[in-house]
C-alpha cells in the first residue's frame, strides 16, 4: 500500500487540515469555553443552515480536539459557504494549536469555569487558555465574549484591536 511516513501522525493530521482549511475563504466561527460549547455550536449551526442550507459545515457531536477538529475541517468542500467548529481543551496550548488549524474569522468564548484544574492552575488560567482563540484571529476578525464575566478584561486584551461583540445576561 502506498503511504507517507511521518514522525508524528497527529501533527501531520493538523497540518493537513490547516492546509485544506486555507483553501476555503469562508466565514468560520470557532466556539470555545468551559461550558456550553456544544450547545452554542449547534445553535449557530442551525442559524447557518437556515442561512446557507447544506452549504454550512458544523462540528458533529463534540469532535473538538486535535483529532476531531482536523477531521471536521477535512469535510470542507467547495459547496460550503460558512462553518462553525467547536474547540475543546484539557491542557495548556491546545486552544492556540486548534485555532491555528481552524483559522477562524469569528471567535466566540462562551465562559471560563473551574475545569481541567489538573492541567490548569486557576480559573484565570482557563480564561487565558480559552481566550487564545481571540489572539489567533486576523486583524479583521470578530471576537465575541461575555460582557458580564469576571474575565472580560482578559478577553478584551487578547482580542486587542479586533472588532469585539459582547453579550450579556443583563
What is each stretch, according to the model?
Residues 49, 77-78, 103, 138-139, ...:
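Short conserved AdoMet
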Residues 90-101:
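Switch II of P-loop NTPase G domains
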Residues 81-92:
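Switch II (G3) loop of P-loop NTPases
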Residues 53-67, 111:
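Short beta-strand-centered segment that lines the nucleotide-binding/catalytic pocket of NTP-utilizing
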Residues 106-170:
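Acidic, Mg2+-coordinating active-site environments of NTP-dependent enzymes
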Residues 59, 66-82:
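P-loop NTPase switch/communication element
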Residues 16, 31, 69, 86, ...:
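Residue-level signal for inorganic ion chemistry
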Residues 1-32, 39-45, 49-51, 67, ...:
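Short, basic phosphate-binding NTP loop
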Amino acid at each position: 500500500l502506498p503511504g507517507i511516513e511521518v514522525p508524528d501522525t497527529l501533527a501531520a493530521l493538523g497540518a493537513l487540515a490547516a492546509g485544506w482549511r486555507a483553501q476555503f475563504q469562508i466565514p468560520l466561527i470557532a466556539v470555545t469555553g468551559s461550558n456550553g460549547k456544544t450547545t452554542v455550536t449547534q445553535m449557530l449551526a442551525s442559524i447557518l443552515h437556515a442561512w446557507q442550507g447544506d452549504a454550512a459545515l458544523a462540528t458533529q457531536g463534540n469532535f473538538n480536539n486535535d483529532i476531531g477538529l482536523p477531521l471536521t475541517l477535512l469535510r470542507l468542500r467547495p459547496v460550503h459557504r460558512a462553518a462553525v467548529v467547536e474547540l475543546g481543551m484539557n491542557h495548556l496550548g491546545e486552544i492556540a494549536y486548534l485555532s491555528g488549524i481552524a483559522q477562524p474569522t469569528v471567535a466566540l468564548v462562551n465562559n471560563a469555569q473551574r475545569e481541567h484544574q489538573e492541567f490548569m492552575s486557576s480559573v484565570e488560567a482557563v480564561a487565558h487558555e480559552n481566550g487564545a482563540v481571540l489572539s489567533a484571529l486576523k486583524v479583521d476578525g470578530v471576537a465575541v465574549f461575555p460582557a458580564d464575566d469576571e474575565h472580560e478584561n482578559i478577553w478584551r486584551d487578547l482580542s486587542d484591536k479586533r472588532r469585539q461583540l459582547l453579550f450579556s445576561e443583563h
